Amino acid sequence: MNDILNIIKGIHPGKFLERELKKRNINQRQFAMAINEHPQTLNAIIKAKRSMNIDLSLKIEKELNFDEGFLMTLQVFYDIKITNKKNQATPD
């Protein structure tokens, strides 16, 4: 997964999840129910309106057989990217 991580770091984990669900032909609502999560919560993450949290990332990673911590690592890289953009936009 490290090679993939280097390619996609800076992308919101929800966008990666959306692509993965489509690739596997998994319905977003059914997936939310399978991991015992509210569909609205999952949708907000997929739309990048909400950050990934540890509990949810572990559920998703287990269900989709991702390496543990993969989605949270994506979230951290995304947060770094956003913070860097904000810092560049505001002068010291």
Predicted features by range, described:
Residues L21, A32, E61:
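The alpha-helix within a helix-turn-helix
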Residues I26-A44:
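Short alpha-helical DNA-recognition segment
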Residues N2-I26, T73:
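A short, Lys/Arg-rich alpha-helix, primarily the initiator
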Residues E20, A34, I45-A48, L74:
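Residues in the recognition helix of alpha-helical DNA-binding motifs
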Residues E18, R29, L58:
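Residues within the helices of the helix-turn-helix
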Residues D55-F70:
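DNA major-groove recognition helix of helix-turn-helix/homeodomain DNA-binding modules
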Residues M72-D92:
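Short, charged recognition helix plus adjacent turn
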